[in-house]
Amino acid sequence: MAHCVTLVQLSVSCDHLIDKDIGSKSDPLCVLLQDVGGGNWTELGRTERVQNCSSPEFSKTLQLEYHFETVQKLRFGIYDIDNKTPELGDDDFLGGAECSLGQIVSSRMLTLPLMLKPGKPAGRGTITVSAQELKDNRVVTMEVEARNLDKKDFLGKSDPFLEFFRQGDGKWHLAYRSEVIKNNLNPTWKRFSVPLQHFCGGDASTPIQVRCSDYDSDGSHDLIGTFHTSLAQLQAAPAEFECIHPEKQQKKKSYKNSGTICVKMCQVETEHSFLDYVMGGCQINFTVGVDFTGSNGDPSSPDSLHYLSPTGVNEYLTALWSVGSVVQDYDSDKLFPAFGFGAQVPPDWQVSHEFALNFNPSNPFCAGIQGIVDAYRQALPQVRLFGPTNFAPIINHVARFAAQAANQRNASQYFVLLLLTDGAVTDVEATREAVVRASYLPMSVIIVGVGCADFEAMEQLDADGGPLHTRSGEAAARDIVQFVPYRRFQNAPREALAQTVLAEVPTQLVSYFRAQGWAPFKPPPPAAKGPAQAPQA
């Protein structure tokens, strides 16, 4: 499971802080806290204290891990420091603000009003936070071939492969090993990329040893030859290096080489990360599809999966809140289309597989996750649960919008469809076709199975064992479906479901944009630095 974990640093500044010192301005410091659950907050770090300043820009940054698949609630507190004790209880509180880390990274620069307590602003005070990923995203990309390698196998040609080692601490450390090319003395290896830090420690002059060997299945690989170089020399590609076998060189005066290694291309490139795309302005468009088929049971019966408990929740709503609360931070307008499928809908009571939950087909958008919840609760008594369970219509619906975004040929939009269902999909072939077509578009599909049905068909859509294929044999470009049964998380912490179903989204998003060759889309920075309405964390 590919969780998106990386280190980010936050830069903080404030404007128009209230003055607590008589005859001078305050001496502010910022402290960062993170919600660790159960109403508890833990301190992650503090900035330096800035003397006599009502609009400080703190030079010390605050560092923390970023996890896409969880809501990381943060609290910033600004204090006027008038003593040397580390405790803040004896210092004046100048205001605070709460938000999620997702809101910060998706906004690029987030400005919030400072509050003394809920509903009481700290004058005109504001706090501005920006994020930067602490990661060297540079990679070394190479294309390498060889000519006239020595024959090492008695009954055939050599089976050559390459190994690149970097020098460090007096040792040679393996940085990359190529695939084996069978029975070939003039091989061309696949293009490959290695993180720059791993390849040479970020230093283009670091000695690099390249070994070419003949593969043996018992592990006793035979050396064909070796040479020494550096990234700086490799970047002069196209370049050729003689492959030398040291023992042969010593024994034979007529020995020239054991072949030639040809570096056709060697470049240092930036391999963009998920945060690069998000902070570059990529909007994640979230759409929900809810199963209203008859197998859910009569919503008025406590046995129904659609039955609303006295607290107003059920498995459908719990799953929606879990996933939606994470994804909503990455969509600036917080307007989410929501659909139902498998029900007879008024006024003609025809079965629909993509009806708007708010019954407004021209504007199916709901305001925030709460808006989807409200639309669901209002739609439930107005439809007749029926069938069958068809996924393809909603997948194709979202795919049409994803195709329009793809036609813009930039990394400005990605689509995530959440399907909540209680049973096996009926239109299996049509759904396979829809998923395969969608795999060529900027979108991912998350399926959460509620109830205790047989979800084997869903597991097949989640093609972890290999690419999904249509009946005609067309293969998916990439794996875009993630399926989990809700019951597996029934007794787990609330955030566990979202952590599992969203874990693959960053990788899926990056793989799509990289395949298209699209760098992060960077819209103009916000025009004004005005305070925003404090979002609900």
From Swiss-Prot:
The entry's keywords: Acetylation, Calcium, Cell membrane, Cytoplasm, Differentiation, Membrane, Metal-binding, Nucleus, Repeat, Repressor, Transcription, Transcription regulation
Pfam families: C2, Copine
Subcellular location, principal: nucleus
Alphabetized InterPro entries for the sequence: C2_dom, C2_domain_sf, C2B_Copine, Copine, Copine_C, VWF_A, vWFA_dom_sf
Tissue expression notes: Expressed in liver, spleen, muscle, testis, adrenal (at protein level).
Known cofactor(s): Ca(2+)
GO molecular function term, any single one: metal ion binding
Domain VWFA span(s) in chain numbering: 285-505
Family: Belongs to the copine family.
Listed PANTHER family: COPINE (PTHR10857), COPINE-1 (PTHR10857:SF2)
This protein's domain notes: C2 domains are necessary for calcium-dependent cell membrane association. C2 domains are necessary for neuronal progenitor cell differentiation in a calcium-independent manner.
Function according to Swiss-Prot or TrEMBL: Calcium-dependent phospholipid-binding protein that plays a role in calcium-mediated intracellular processes. Involved in the TNF-alpha receptor signaling pathway in a calcium-dependent manner. Exhibits calcium-dependent phospholipid binding properties. Plays a role in neuronal progenitor cell differentiation; induces neurite outgrowth via a AKT-dependent signaling cascade and calcium-independent manner. May recruit target proteins to the cell membrane in a calcium-dependent manner. May function in membrane trafficking.
Subunit structure: Homodimer; homodimerizes via its C2 domains. Interacts with p65/RELA (via N-terminus); this interaction induces proteolytic cleavage of p65/RELA subunit and inhibition of NF-kappa-B transcriptional activity. Interacts (via VWFA domain) with ACTB, CCDC22, MYCBP2, PPP5C, RDX and UBE2O.
Protein's UniProt name: Copine-1
Organism: Bos taurus
Gene for this chain: CPNE1
